[in-house]
Each structure stands twice: as structure tokens, then as C-alpha cells.
Amino acid sequence: MSTPKAPTGHFTLLYFASATSFTRKQHDFFAAPLLLAKLYNAIEEKYPGMRAKVLESSALTVNLDYVDVDEEVQKGDKGLVIQAGDEVAIIPPVSSG
């Protein structure tokens, strides 16, 4: 299944596994540009409780590249900016056995 193209001026946020269960969606669109350091606040505003239950234990990719969210938060206004048309994904922990 393909993800619909983000509307003009927005980026796509993809959800997988527990993130999909929490949001009951496979994707969302958020207005761009947005500092990556502010992304978790934007998600938490839309889905209260998601930071503690999903985001704090998940990885994040921007255009298929893994990003260190803590490092980006420390950079503040000089950190990575998510641009219109970008694809961001929340990757919850994967277990194997």
C-alpha cells in the first residue's frame, strides 16, 4: 500500500507497529518546515501520552536516514529542519526470538 502524497507545505509522518496501534493510523501530515527538535511536541499535542508510551523507545528516520533525536534537541534552533515533501517515520523497537 502506498502512502498518499503530502499536501503542499507538509511532510509525511509514517507510523509502524505500536505507533500505528496508538494513533490508529498509518500516516499523518504535518506542516513544514518544522524543527525536528519540535516534532515530538507536535505529535504529543495531537496524541496525548504517545511520547511516554511510544516515542521515547522508538527510533526516527528522515528520508530513510536514522536521526539521533536527543542530539537534535540539544542543537535547538540549529538542528535538522524537516522540509515540505520529506518522509519521516517512527520505528518502534523490533524484537526477535
Predicted features, each with a name:
Residues 1-96:
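Ubiquitin-like/PB1-type beta-grasp interaction modules and other compact soluble beta-rich domains
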